[in-house]
Curated annotation (Swiss-Prot):
The gene coding this protein: PECAM1
Modified residues (Phosphoserine): S730, S735
Sugar-bearing residue positions: N52, N84, N151, N301, N320, N356, N371, N435, N446, N453, N550, N578
PANTHER family cross-referenced by the UniProt entry: IMMUNOGLOBULIN FC RECEPTOR, PLATELET ENDOTHELIAL CELL ADHESION MOLECULE
Signal peptide: 1-27
Function in brief: Cell adhesion molecule which is required for leukocyte transendothelial migration (TEM) under most inflammatory conditions. Tyr-689 plays a critical role in TEM and is required for efficient trafficking of PECAM1 to and from the lateral border recycling compartment (LBRC) and is also essential for the LBRC membrane to be targeted around migrating leukocytes. Trans-homophilic interaction may play a role in endothelial cell-cell adhesion via cell junctions. Heterophilic interaction with CD177 plays a role in transendothelial migration of neutrophils.
The organism of origin for this protein: Bos taurus (Bovine)
Keywords of the record: Cell adhesion, Cell junction, Cell membrane, Disulfide bond, Glycoprotein, Immunoglobulin domain, Lipoprotein, Membrane, Palmitate, Phosphoprotein, Repeat, Signal, Transmembrane, Transmembrane helix
Name assigned to this protein: Platelet endothelial cell adhesion molecule
Length: 739
C-alpha cells in the first residue's frame, strides 16, 4: 500500500516537473535569421532545346533551437510562381524536363520563415533552338493543276510561331515556291500549294521560328514525303497542211492537237493565236483547226495554248507563204486638180504578170482596166484604189487621194446692222463665196490693211466682229485650193455716227446790269451732225430755248437783261447716237443782275470786311507778341506820334488821322494794304515796349481843338541794324475818335 502511494507520488512529481519544464521553454522563444539565399541553374543558364534544366535554391538559416525551423521555398519565372515547397533542408530543387523556347526567361528563388523572407537576384535562362517541326501532306500523288495541303506543326512549343514552307522539285536546287505565315494562337499552320504544269516529283520543307525576347530561335528545316505529279494533258503539237512549201492560193490548215489523260474530268480549251489575235479555239475535243486560203498576210508566228483551270501549256510554229505576185501599185498624174482638168490613173504589178485589174473609188468600180482617164469635176474628189487578181488571189493596191478644186465665186460682203452704226458698237461683217471647194480662207481688210483672217470648212459665210470708230470701208478676199488667185468682194462702206461728248456752257458776262445783254455759248467736243441743243434754267423742266443745227457750238442771247433773268443755267446736247437716257448735260452757271447802287454798296461792304479782318489780325498778332515778351516798360508823356512803316505822323493831325484805324498805313483808302513785314526785319531784332499817354479830343470838338482826355498807348520799338530803317508799330487801346 505504501509502495503504491510512493509510485503514484513519483508520477505526480514527474508530471509536475514536465509542466514546469514546458512553462520554462514557453517563456523563452527561439531566435532565428536567414543568413543567405542563393540559386544555381544546372547544367548552366544557356541550354539547348530539349535538355533538362534544374533550379536549385540554397538557404542558410541560423536559429537558437535545436530543431531546424520549417521554411517555405518558392520558385518564380518572370514574376510568375512556378513551384512552392515547405522544407527544413538547406537545398531545394525544381526540375524542368525537355526545355522549350517558352522556358526562356528570368528565374528567382524566395524563402519565407515566419514573418521573415529573402529573395535571390533574377537569373536569365536562354533556351537555344526550336524543336523539329512535323510536316504532313494530304496526298502523295496529284494531277497537274491539283492542290496539295501541307500541315506544319511544333507540338511541344507554344504560340506564336512563324512558319516557312517551301516547295522543291526533286533533283533541282532552289525552291519553286515559298510561303510564310505566323500562327498567333496555335503551334501549327495549314497551307495549300497548287501543282503547276512543270511539276513532276515534288516535296515540301518546313521551318519554325519563335521570338524569345530580343532573340529569334529557329528550328531545323524538315522535309516532307515525295509527291508524284501526273499530267492531265500533254504539251500541244502543231500540224501544218500542206506540208513543205505553201503558195498563195493554197488551202492552208493549221491544226493543234493535245493528248488528255483519263484522270482529267473534261477537255481543256485549245486556242490558236497569230500575233496575239485568236484565229481558232475549241474546248469540246482534243484539237483545234484554222483553215484559210493562203496569202502573204498569213505569214507569221502561230501559238497554241492549252488551258485548264490553273494549267496552261504553250507551243509555237512559224508559217511561211510564198508570194504568187506582188502587190499592185496605183499611180496618178496629179493628186490636186482644178475643176475641168484631166485625171490619169495607172495600175501596175511589178514583173507585169497577166492579171485582172479593177479601179475603184470609195468601194465603187470606176474602171475594169489598168488605166482610167477622166475630165474631173468637184464630185470626182475621193479615195481611189486598184484591185489585181491572179487565179483565186486578189490584192489591193495603195490608196490615192484625189482632190478636185472648184473655183470660188466672187465673195459678197455685208453687215448685220439695220440702222446707223454708233461709234464703239460691235457689228458683224460677213463674207461669203457661194460656190467653191472648201475649206475657204477669208481675209477682211480695212483700206488695204488686214483686219482679221478666218477659215471656213463649208460655203457658209465667215463672220467678223469689228468695232468701227469712224466711217470706214471694208473689203474681203477669198481663197481655196484652186490655182486661181484670190477673189475680192465689193467695197462695203460703213457710216459711223459719234454720240455727243462733253457739253460745256459759257456765259459772256456773269454779272450784268439791267438793260445789258446776256449771251450763252453751249459747245461739245465731238458729235455727229445734226446736234440738238437745249437751254434750261435751274428748277425748270422745259427748255426756254432749243435748236438743231450742224455745228458743235450754239449761241443764245438776250439783248436787255432784267432782274427776272437772274439764276442758274445749263444746257444739254444730243444727237441720234445718244439714247434718250444718255443726254449729255453741261456745267451749271450763275447769272446775277445788279442795280448800279447795289454794285457800289457791295464794293463798300467788301472793302470794309477786308479792313476789319486786317485790323483784327494785326491786333491779335501784337497781343500775342506782348504776352510772349512780358517786358512792359511804363512811361508817360503828353503826346507821342505813332509810327508806321513809311512815315511818322502824330495822332493829333487834323483831317488825316482822326477817322483812321490803327495798324494800317495811308494807302488803306486806296484798297491797298502794305504788309507789316515790308522791310523784312530779321527775327532777332531787339524790342522795347513803352507806355504812352495820348490826349484825345472831345467828341463834340473839332479836329483842331485839343481835348483834355488822355489814353494810355503801348508802343513797340524795334532796334534794327544800321543798314535798315527803324520801324515802329504803335497800337492804342480803343479808337482815336473814342468810338
Amino acid at each position: 500500500m505504501q509502495l503504491r502511494w510512493t509510485q503514484r507520488g513519483m508520477m505526480w512529481l514527474g508530471a509536475l516537473l514536465t509542466l514546469l519544464l514546458c512553462s520554462s521553454l514557453k517563456g523563452q522563444e527561439n531566435s532565428f535569421t536567414i543568413n543567405s539565399i542563393h540559386m544555381q541553374i544546372l547544367p548552366h543558364s544557356t541550354v539547348q532545346n530539349g535538355e533538362n534544366l534544374t533550379l536549385q535554391c540554397l538557404v542558410d538559416v541560423s536559429t537558437t533551437s535545436r530543431v531546424k525551423p520549417l521554411h517555405q521555398v518558392l520558385f518564380y519565372k518572370d514574376d510568375v510562381l512556378l513551384h512552392n515547397v515547405s522544407s527544413r533542408r538547406n537545398t531545394e530543387s525544381y526540375l524542368i524536363p525537355h526545355v522549350r523556347v517558352c522556358d526562356s526567361g528570368r528565374y528567382k528563388c524566395n524563402v519565407i520563415l515566419n514573418n521573415k523572407e529573402k529573395t535571390t537576384p533574377e537569373y536569365e535562362v536562354w533556351v537555344k533552338g526550336v524543336s523539329d517541326p512535323r510536316v504532313t501532306l494530304d496526298k502523295k500523288e496529284v494531277i497537274e493543276g491539283g492542290v496539295v495541303v501541307v500541315n506544319c506543326s511544333v507540338p511541344e512549343e507554344k504560340a506564336p510561331v512563324h512558319f516557312t514552307i517551301e516547295k522543291f522539285e526533286l533533283n533541282i536546287r532552289g525552291a519553286k515556291k515559298k510561303r510564310e505565315k505566323t500562327s498567333q494562337n496555335q503551334n501549327f499552320v495549314t497551307l495549300e500549294f497548287t501543282v503547276e504544269e512543270q511539276d513532276r516529283t515534288i516535296r515540301f520543307q518546313c521551318q519554325a521560328k519563335i521570338f524569345s525576347g530580343s532573340n529569334v530561335e529557329s528550328s531545323r528545316p524538315i522535309q516532307s514525303d515525295l509527291v508524284t505529279v501526273r499530267e492531265s494533258f500533254s504539251n500541244p503539237k502543231f500540224h501544218i497542211i500542206p506540208e513543205g512549201k505553201v503558195m498563195e492560193g493554197d488551202d492552208l490548215q493549221v491544226k493543234c492537237t493535245v493528248q488528255v489523260t483519263h484522270q482529267a474530268q473534261s477537255f481543256p480549251e485549245i486556242i490558236i493565236q497569230k500575233d496575239r489575235e485568236i484565229v481558232a479555239h475549241n474546248s469540246l475535243s482534243s484539237e483545234a483547226v484554222y483553215s484559210v486560203m493562203a496569202t502573204t498576210e498569213h505569214n507569221g508566228n502561230y501559238t497554241c495554248k492549252v488551258e485548264a483551270s490553273r494549267i496552261s501549256k504553250v507551243s509555237s510554229v512559224v508559217v511561211n507563204v510564198t508570194e504568187l505576185f506582188s502587190k499592185p501599185k496605183l499611180e496618178s498624174s496629179a493628186t490636186h486638180l482644178d475643176q475641168g482638168e484631166d485625171l490619169n490613173l495607172l495600175c501596175s504589178i511589178p514583173g507585169a504578170p497577166p492579171a485582172n485589174f479593177t479601179i475603184q473609188k470609195g468601194g465603187m468600180t470606176v474602171s475594169q482596166t489598168q488605166n482610167f482617164t477622166k475630165r474631173v469635176s468637184e464630185w470626182d474628189s475621193g479615195l481611189y484604189t486598184c484591185v489585181a487578181g491572179v487565179g483565186r488571189v486578189f490584192k489591193r493596191s495603195n490608196t490615192v487621194q484625189i482632190t478636185v478644186c472648184e473655183m470660188l465665186s466672187k465673195p459678197s460682203i455685208f453687215h448685220d446692222s439695220r440702222s446707223e452704226v454708233i461709234k464703239g458698237q460691235t457689228i458683224e461683217v460677213s463674207c461669203q463665196s457661194v460656190n467653191g471647194t472648201a475649206p475657204i480662207f477669208y481675209q477682211l481688210s480695212n483700206t488695204s490693211k488686214p483686219v482679221a483672217n478666218q477659215s471656213v470648212g463649208s460655203n457658209k459665210p465667215a463672220i467678223f466682229r469689228v468695232k468701227p470708230t469712224k466711217d470706214v470701208e471694208y473689203c474681203c478676199s477669198a481663197d481655196n485650193c484652186h490655182s486661181h488667185s484670190k477673189m475680192f468682194s465689193e467695197v462695203l462702206r460703213v457710216k459711223v455716227i459719234a454720240p455727243v461728248d462733253e457739253a460745256q456752257l459759257v456765259v459772256l458776262k456773269g454779272e450784268v446790269e439791267p438793260g445789258e445783254p446776256i449771251v450763252f455759248y453751249c459747245s461739245v467736243n465731238e458729235g455727229s451732225f445734226p446736234i440738238t441743243y437745249k437751254f434750261y434754267k435751274e428748277k425748270e423742266s422745259k427748255p426756254f430755248y432749243q435748236d438743231t443745227i450742224n455745228a458743235t457750238q450754239i449761241m443764245w442771247h438776250k439783248t436787255t437783261a432784267s432782274k427776272e433773268y437772274e439764276g442758274q443755267y445749263y444746257c444739254t446736247a444730243s444727237n441720234r447716237a445718244n439714247l434718250s437716257k444718255h443726254v449729255i448735260q453741261s456745267n451749271t452757271l450763275t447769272v446775277r443782275v445788279y442795280l448800279p447802287l447795289e454794285k457800289g454798296l457791295i464794293a463798300v461792304v467788301v472793302i470794309g470786311v477786308i479792313i476789319v479782318t486786317l485790323v483784327l489780325g494785326a491786333k491779335c498778332y501784337f497781343l500775342k507778341k506782348a504776352k510772349a515778351k512780358q517786358m512792359p516798360v511804363e512811361m508817360s508823356r503828353p503826346a507821342v506820334p505813332l509810327l508806321n512803316s513809311n512815315n511818322e505822323k502824330t495822332l493829333s493831325d487834323a483831317g488825316t488821322e482822326a477817322d483812321r484805324h490803327y495798324g494800317y498805313n495811308e494807302d488803306v483808302g486806296n484798297h491797298a494794304m502794305k504788309p507789316l513785314n515790308e522791310n523784312k526785319e530779321p527775327l532777332t531784332l531787339d524790342v522795347e515796349y513803352t507806355e504812352v499817354e495820348v490826349t484825345s479830343p472831345e467828341p463834340h470838338q473839332g479836329l483842331g481843338t485839343k481835348g483834355t482826355e488822355t489814353e494810355t498807348v503801348y508802343s513797340e520799338i524795334r532796334k534794327a541794324d544800321p543798314d535798315f530803317v527803324e520801324n515802329r508799330y504803335s497800337r492804342t487801346e480803343g479808337s482815336l475818335d473814342g468810338s
